[in-house]
Amino acid sequence: MGVYKFCYNKKKEVGQVAVLQKERLIFYIVTKEKSYLKPTLANFSNAIDSLYNECLLRKCCKLAIPKIGCCLDRLYWKTVKNIIIDKLCKKGIEVVVYYI
């Protein structure tokens, strides 16, 4: 099952997070209505808030994430990074950003 179908089946809307739990937790943040659209900063920020809440719920205190919101989504990394710092790192979630 693809990511889109997985999130669709979970009935997740923009600003929410779909969670897949097998050997490890995988969080899919929903930042836009369609894959070809650009997310707004408000939707991105709301999705990061939802990610924080899911981390609390599942006692997850460390995340490894790609450079989300950039590249195809065309958000500025400096802005995205500040949202991640304010909404995750300053609240006790350790975040490691990796590059693919």
Swiss-Prot record:
One of its GO terms (biological process) is peptidyl-glutamate ADP-deribosylation. This is Uncharacterized protein 032R. It comes from Invertebrate iridescent virus 6.
